Amino acid sequence: MQEIHSITLWGDSVMRGVVYDEQRGRYGLLPENAAERASKTLGLTLHNRSRMGCTVTKGLSIMKRDMEAGMDSQAALLEFGGNDCDYDWAAVARDPEGDHQPKTPLGLFMEQLREMVAAVRQKGMRPIITTLPPIHARRYFDFFTRGGLSRENILFWLGDIEYIYRWHERYNGAVVQ
């Protein structure tokens, strides 16, 4: 097995090192995220192509563009799913009886993640896929409804708050496959 000296990361805000700053009431970048610390500790060259709000669809587009431009590493770390499984909560609040779909339907998510893995392998890179970080359904619900979205309407559509966790877990299960 070839020793890895360089890794390209494609993912969302988690991989980018974006965190919510409670005091400032907005998102910001960590001064040094976990990926950067790991690269320094392990002596790896790191190319972080992750973007806040990125779905697997956008990530695949970025990856293709990067590879066409000559981006090359020995490994690729892929971290997607959190934004993909999310809903347009404002639309759900406005129409709790409507048919709402996640940003990336599960089947398309799986298809595009497989396409990313195939592209990485074709480039001679080793794919590394992360699972989704755990979600606390109640805290996430409180977070996205804090601006005044109708909690009652969203709860009607969800059935129960823990549906958020169960839905998120389906995308995590797809990553594990």
Q: What role is predicted for each listed range?
A:
Residues 52-54, 133:
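Short, solvent-exposed coil/turn elements at secondary-structure transition points
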Residues 54-63:
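Structural motif
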Residues 1-50, 66-72, 76:
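Serine-esterase "nucleophile elbow" of acetyl-processing enzymes
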Residues 50-52, 82:
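Short glycine-rich, polar/acidic loop-and-turn segments at beta strand-coil junctions
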Residues 2, 64-177:
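Alpha-helical cap/lid subdomain in secreted, periplasmic
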Residues 31, 59-60, 112-113:
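Amphipathic coiled-coil/heptad-repeat helices and related helical stalk/stem segments
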